Amino acid sequence: LIKSPPASGKSRALMFIALDKLANQGIKQAIVVVPEKSIGASFNDEPLSKFGFWADWQVAPKWNLCNSPGTDGGKVKSVTAFLESSDQILVCTHATFRFAVEKIGVEAFDDRLIAVDEFHHVSASEDSILGKQLNDCIARDRVHVVAMTGSYFRGDAVPILVPENEAKF
């Protein structure tokens, strides 16, 4: 869980975490999930090695689905193609991720990092599709989840995750 105020470096912190997980922790791919397309720009290429890190954050243009034209249906096909590829980083919206999980199932994301920006948009409510999908992923214990938010609390009384999954953070 990365909880920090807006514009304080959560996206940059995730880049370091994801690159380490990809290189050293057996994770196949990193999927960054953002609430809207404009936030996807926070995850554009970054020359981290310029500042002493051992790798750079690089997202192939075709895998930053926030910058690509098309409908969610076409983007779901792109998510599927990404999962079948050897490329390592994908950026997409919450909606695209939800539709992809609905189509191909949570099992398709095994052994991957799922990083969810603006995590407070998730809810344990049965009405929250993204919340249910993330709870299912966490319950399978086959994915690494990084939650990023400025505030871990929602404005309503609904918890973000079910208690047994929240305890895993």
Show the residue positions of the predicted features.
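Alpha-helical scaffold elements adjacent to nucleotide-binding pockets in ATP/GTP-utilizing enzyme cores
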Residues: 13-17, 42-50, 114, 129-133, ...
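Inter-Walker segment of RecA-like/P-loop motor cores
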Residues: 53-99
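Conserved Walker A/P-loop ATP-binding site and its immediately adjacent core
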Residues: 11-13, 22, 26-56, 96
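Conserved H-loop
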Residues: 7, 35, 150-151
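Walker A/P-loop
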Residues: 1-17
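Interdomain helical connector at the RecA1-RecA2 junction of SF1/SF2 helicase-like NTPases
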Residues: 144, 156-169
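Switch/connector loops and helix/strand junctions flanking conserved nucleotide-binding motifs
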Residues: 40-45, 99-100, 123-124, 154-159
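SF2 helicase catalytic motif II
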Residues: 94-96, 105-147, 151-152
